[in-house]
């Protein structure tokens, strides 16, 4: 176990301009600050560049970025694809021609690389495989993140899909569980609706073998709503 922080440091599998040892050195970060034991690496960007198999061939993320004594959490990449959808809407509103081609289906989420326009699909299964290749300690399932301001009916639809994806992800991960370096977390959704978050947490508890994550926060809603969700999270 380890103490969690309000935020985790996000990397692209590298720390620039800083010796990694300093992140855990109290003389550098200050004696009042808990040494950093967990960093987050971005699955979406690592999948596209340099590619999870290249990271795997280099010995996994811990060897790749020389983070040998700490833990690494990887996200599913779903939020980044969600963000691409918002970017697509923004560009369309400004009458630009930039297209990122986001399409949410039962199979997964289809998108185009923002780097070269190539087509890709994230599924509950291949996202687990990608994170296993990266050598993550804490992995996340592919969920559906509802945009801020979504009505309750839309969020309920997204929660149902999130739950189906979690079931698929854990069925796929179960045979790998003993050999995998890391553990897999389901992600609770529900927007700002405490009743929906409670329902989501109750359903996903069957998959909380090692932990559970809270998703769909800080996606454009007001600070007041974020605080409400934080208070509700403690209740859930």
Residue ranges, per PLM feature:
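Intervening/peripheral non-core polypeptide segments
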Residues: 31, 231-236
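Non-catalytic, usually N-terminal nucleic-acid engagement modules in DNA/RNA processing proteins
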Residues: 5-177
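Glycine-rich phosphate/ribose-binding loops and adjacent secondary-structure elements
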Residues: 172, 176-233
